[in-house]
Structures are given as C-alpha cells and as structure tokens.
A protein has these predicted regions:
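Glycine-rich, proline-tolerant flexible connector loops at the mouths of alpha/beta enzymes
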Residues: 118-119, 123, 130-138, 193-214
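Conserved, mostly hydrophobic/aromatic
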Residues: 185
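Active-site mouth loops of central-metabolism enzymes
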Residues: 81, 160-178
Length: 288
C-alpha cells in the first residue's frame, strides 16, 4: 500500500513505526480494547498507538476511496458502500485529511445542516478514522450539532429529551414474569423509547406469544411506545407473515459479507425484512 503513495510510517520518540496496510493503522489507532488484544490487532503499547494516530491524522480522506478494507469484488457490503458513495456530497470535504476533517467537524461554523449535507459522502471508514482522533468531549460536541428525530407512537431525538428502553427479559421467557417486569419498569417511568425483549430462545411460536403479550399490555394502558422481540430477522419476517403485531424489526449486522454470514444474513435478506416491516398496516409503521 505504501507503494501506492500512502504514507504508513512515522518516526516517534526515536523509533520508526511502519504499518503493513491501512487496516493495521486503523486497528493500532483504536483505544485500548481487550478484544483487539485477543485478536492480535491492537497497538503493542501507547507509543505505537500514538504513532498510528499521527499517520491517520495526515491521511487524506480520498485514501479511503481507493483503499477499501475488504475487496470490492468479493464483498457485497463494500460494494454497497462504494456504489452509494455520493461524490458531490464528498466534494466539500475531499481536500481534507482525517485530522483536518476532525477540525472541520468541531469548527463553530460547521452546524448540523452542514454535516448533513456531506453525510452521503462520508464512508464508514472515514467516520471510524476521525473518531479515533477524537476525545470523548469531541465526540459529544460533534454529535450535539446533529438532530436525528424519529417518530412512531413516541418521538425520539428532540433536544433536551431522554428516552429509555425497558428490557423485561426472563431466563425462560415466561410471559407472566415478563409482564411483571414490564409493569415494574413502566411504573418507574421507563419504556418510552421502546419495550424490547431479548428472548432466551429464538423460535417462532415463542416470539409471536411475546409480541401479543407486549401489544396487549401497550393497548390496555394506552402506552405511547413501541415494542420489539429481538429475534433473528427471519423469525420476525415469519411472524409478520402470520399476522403478529410487530412494531420494530431487529437484526445484528456487521461491516463485511463474511461477518454477516456469521449472523446468517445477507443484504438481500435485510432488504426483505425492511420490505416486510414497511408493508405493515393497521396503524403500524414499523421501522427496519
């Protein structure tokens, strides 16, 4: 990669640090995480971490357009990202380095509308790279500029508001236990964001039973919220096909085709799930 004109080396504290590729720089620049250490991709020490951040700060944002982490030819997630990248939106920030992008995001004259205007030109790797150069205070300051407001039965994302998810899980998915836990949480003012159950078992019959339970609870007390049973997307699709009261679709996703395969999903399946959710009627406007 260095032969492509990308600088992946820096001298720091009397030592020259050189990285094999951009992925190695990104990994080493991350804050310390035990999972990265176990995976063998973390920086060896704090100095190497700082050296990776030096390299990242001077890296032009354009680099990420030509050096994707997973090959375009073999990965459908990469193809989705590259094919949807908006060159016109990117033009505003195209001359910047990753470090310059951080300064641009933090600048007083960069407001939420300005960030939204370039958002379609920001690849996930660009966002990940700049976050590695930001302190927590920086991330908070940048995020505070942006408003993402969503509405279903309740509204989330308004300035100065806080919403809470109620999670009435039960070790055996016992409906009575879940109902009792849900009522307890509601009495404490939780659940305005959503009532979401992580089921102990992922099966269609159990999922449908829990969906009806939450729907009856919400309807009986006229609670302005939405519910979700966090099952695999195929289970949720099947529940919709059987007329279950699905409000929200859930699915864990990853950043590569191979990782998504580990979750048992593809982009086609995700699109199918979204279409199923959007097809719901009868007062439901489910979100995928």
């Amino acid at each position: 990669m260095a032969g492509d004109g990308v600088n992946l080396a820096v001298d720091l504290a009397g030592t020259r640090y050189r990285f094999a590729d951009l992925a190695a720089v990104m990994a080493a620049a991350s804050p310390y995480r035990s999972g990265d250490v176990l995976a063998g991709i973390a920086a060896r020490d704090a100095t190497e971490r700082v050296s990776a951040r030096y390299i990242l700060a001077d890296l032009p944002l354009r680099t990420f357009l030509s050096h994707v982490p997973v090959p375009y030819e073999t990965d459908e997630v990469t193809r989705l990202i590259v094919d949807r990248h908006d060159a016109d939106a990117f033009a505003t920030i195209a001359p910047l380095t990753v470090g310059g992008f951080r300064e641009w995001l933090l600048a007083d004259d960069t407001d939420g509308a300005t960030i939204a205007a370039v958002s379609a030109g920001i690849m996930p790797e660009m966002a990940a790279a700049v976050s590695k150069l930001c302190r927590n205070q920086d991330l908070i300051a940048i995020a505070a500029k942006i408003r993402v407001v969503t509405r279903f039965r309740s509204t989330m994302g308004l300035a100065g508001t806080l919403a809470v998810r109620l999670q009435p899980n039960h070790p055996t998915d016992d409906p009575a236990g879940i109902a009792a836990s849900a009522l307890d949480g509601l009495l404490m003012g939780c659940g305005d964001a959503m009532i979401g159950i992580n089921p102990a078992r992922d099966n269609l019959a159990g999922t449908i039973e829990l969906l009806h339970l939450l729907d009856r609870l919400r309807d009986r007390y006229a609670i302005p919220t939405q519910s979700c049973v966090l099952t695999h997307i195929t289970t949720s699709i099947a529940a919709i096909e059987r007329g279950a009261p699905v409000d929200l679709m859930f699915q864990s996703i990853a950043g590569s085709q191979a990782a998504n395969a580990g979750f048992g999903i593809t982009l086609t399946l995700l699109a199918e799930g979204r279409d199923a959710a959007r097809s719901l009627t009868g007062g439901r406007s489910a979100i995928s």
